[in-house]
Amino acid sequence: VRGISVGVYQSSLPPEIAYMLQYTGASVVLAEDQEQVDKLYEIRSEIPHVRYVIYEDEKGMRGYKDPWLLSFAEVLERGREHRRKHPDAVERLLLEASPEEVCHLSSTSGTTGRPKAAMLRHRNLIHMGVALQEVDPLLPTDDYLSFLPLAWIGEQMMSVAMALTGGFAVNFPEEVETALQDLKEIGPHVMFSPPRVWEGIQSQVWVRISESPRFNRFVYERLLKVGYRAAEYRMRGRPMPLGLRLAYWLADQV
């Protein structure tokens, strides 16, 4: 629909949200749940340009009777009705769009001052995805687990730009707290995050291993060595010896 998106972190405080909405002139806000909606109510007088707040999770929202609020389900129904009346509207907007149009505002970290918004065009995002595909190609059969905020440019790069150019499936955890369990169930081919996230995951894994029975620790340590050896061959682009291929296959079954 030729809109421009901008991300705000879930952990942002009301004054930080107010600044970002004022700075970008946002007219519609998509909020996850009651907690985020309440933050917006705190700053409502400061953001008169916001016409609607769309909330996804309806839990706890029954008592909110305000035309300012729309449930995501209601927005979908309005979209279906509009589609019935104007079946070619979306296609017309797509044809009118230009690769040079701004489609996303990516905020800086704000560590040295208030965050600034970098303007990204459609061409910027697609070029980013194409360039990544040339360096580290992914296949349409691959699964990617998105568990970091879309307000971060790294997640925009993977879940939007690279997914559009590579065509792989983007999976999301049910909740932030269940990300590790969901990771095990989904078994993604690729993940992306800054080092501190990997360090946190590694720490949780090591704690669970240290608390497991002695036999489990023994098996884990042996299979970890197999994984390291296999990774070395893969990263160098060399074929694994038959014995290592067999050991890696067995480790994968475990």
Model-predicted regions and their roles:
Residues 126-143, 150-253:
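Conserved AMP-binding/adenylation subdomain of ANL enzymes
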Residues 18, 91-94, 180:
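Short hydrophobic/charged patches on amphipathic alpha-helices used for structural packing
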Residues 29, 102, 108-111, 144, ...:
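Conserved S/T- and glycine-rich ATP-binding loop of Class I adenylate-forming
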Residues 30, 69-70, 96, 119, ...:
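Short aromatic/basic micro-patch
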Residues 69-107, 114, 137-143:
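Conserved pre-ATP/AMP-binding loop-to-beta segment of ANL
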Residues 3-78:
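Structural core segment of the AMP-binding/adenylate-forming
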Residues 5, 28, 144, 170-171:
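A short hydrophobic/small-residue beta-strand
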